[in-house]
């Protein structure tokens, strides 16, 4: 089907009305020289399909972070990992923030998971505040998914709040998925 008007993803940088585009992970300073050189150096590898298990990357992350390879999951973008989380762990009822990245609800529902929402308030500039903790404590589900910073609000959850959320999720044996891509 053809559309008379485009339905683009991301900002319209070509209109010159946008200085910085936060709708996609685009470096506003351009591609670093080291990345350009890495692309040039690997052109001959383009005939090979990438390693689906990302063995070299997993090894490098494991060594750099000092964690076992079995604790590392790599994928082709955040959406693949979000869907993998939902399929692999199979939560029955998950809590997401509202507003938030729409892919969480899509992935959860695709895995036959019931989705509940905790609404962030305009009056508090969409910050996650203390009223969330008692709500989470009494939530009758088995998973919590959110991004930090929040998409689309850009609000960052404090370290203290993250630690309290983690404590509640551990005590309640809830899956916790924190997306920090941006």
Regions found by a protein language model. Give the residues of each.
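N-terminal "arm"/small-domain region of PLP-dependent enzymes with the aminotransferase-like
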Residues: 1-48, 140
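Short loop-beta-helix segment that forms the pyridoxal 5′-phosphate
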Residues: 50, 62-84
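Short, structured coil segments at secondary-structure junctions
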Residues: 68, 111-112
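Short acidic capping loops at alpha-helix termini that bridge into adjacent secondary structure
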Residues: 68-72, 93, 173, 180
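Glycine/small-residue-rich loop that forms an oxyanion/phosphate-binding "nest" at active or ligand-binding sites
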Residues: 77-86, 90, 178, 182
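Conserved PLP-anchoring active-site segment centered on the Schiff-base-forming lysine
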Residues: 88-109, 134
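Active-site phosphate-binding strand-loop segment of PLP-dependent enzymes
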Residues: 116, 122-182
């Amino acid at each position: 089907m053809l559309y008379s008007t485009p339905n683009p993803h991301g900002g319209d940088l070509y209109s010159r009305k946008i200085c910085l585009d936060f709708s996609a992970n685009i470096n506003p300073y351009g591609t670093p020289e080291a990345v350009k050189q890495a692309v040039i150096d690997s052109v001959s590898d383009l005939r090979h399909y990438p390693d689906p298990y990302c063995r070299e990357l997993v090894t490098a992350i494991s060594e750099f972070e000092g964690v076992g390879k079995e604790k590392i999951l790599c994928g082709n973008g955040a959406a693949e990992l979000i869907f993998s989380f939902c399929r692999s762990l199979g939560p029955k009822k998950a809590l997401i923030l509202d507003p938030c990245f729409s892919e969480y609800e899509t992935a959860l529902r695709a895995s036959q998971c019931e989705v509940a929402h905790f609404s962030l308030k305009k009056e508090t500039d969409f910050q996650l505040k203390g009223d969330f903790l008692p709500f989470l404590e009494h939530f009758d589900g088995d998973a919590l998914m959110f991004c930090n910073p929040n998409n689309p609000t850009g609000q960052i959850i404090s370290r203290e709040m993250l630690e309290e959320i983690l404590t509640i999720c551990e005590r309640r044996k809830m899956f916790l998925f924190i997306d920090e891509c941006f």
